[in-house]
């Protein structure tokens, strides 16, 4: 239905989570734990708590710094623009991940006022999860960058 080549992605090591209609929040928490155990440094995770409060609580209980990050289009626009800029500059690196390319091909951008971008699925049954996660990660990085610059200014005074 969503045109994901499940067996191919599984064979290539890209498919690490289930493809069920709903997601068990504990499965995602365990995935993050496994990534951390492999040595991947995870500074923060942004998540809109209104979509799964149990996941939010589970991540905090597992020791992750999870930040409430509502999915406002005007906020996600900044992350989208960051990805767009890196792509245009030839500096977008996504490990050649087929799932990222698949999700990117399912995204349509809609220009709003003041050059804001709202994006949506091209096909309702197709997925954009990996792209959406990349946008969220860009938003977290940009917000942290701003906070660290403010802190440096305050400490240097």
Language-model features and meaning:
Residues 1-71, 77, 81, 94-157:
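RNase H-like, metal-dependent nuclease domains and their acidic two-metal-ion catalytic environment used
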Residues 80-89:
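Short, surface-exposed amphipathic charged segments that create phosphate/polyanion-binding patches used
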């Amino acid at each position: 239905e969503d045109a994901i080549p499940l067996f191919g992605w599984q064979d290539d090591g890209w498919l690490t989570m289930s493809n069920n209609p709903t997601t068990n929040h504990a499965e995602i928490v365990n995935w993050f734990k496994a990534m951390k155990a492999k040595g991947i440094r995870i500074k923060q995770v942004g998540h809109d708590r209104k979509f799964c409060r149990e996941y939010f609580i589970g991540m905090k209980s597992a020791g992750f710094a999870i930040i409430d990050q509502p999915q406002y289009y005007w906020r996600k626009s900044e992350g989208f623009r960051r990805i767009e800029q890196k792509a245009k500059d030839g500096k977008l690196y996504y490990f050649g991940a087929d799932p990222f390319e698949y999700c990117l091909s399912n995204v349509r951008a809609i220009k709003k006022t003041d050059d804001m971008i709202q994006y949506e699925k091209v096909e309702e049954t197709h997925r954009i999860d990996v792209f959406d996660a990349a946008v969220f990660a860009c938003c977290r990085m940009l917000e942290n960058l701003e906070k660290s610059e403010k802190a440096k200014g305050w400490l240097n005074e």
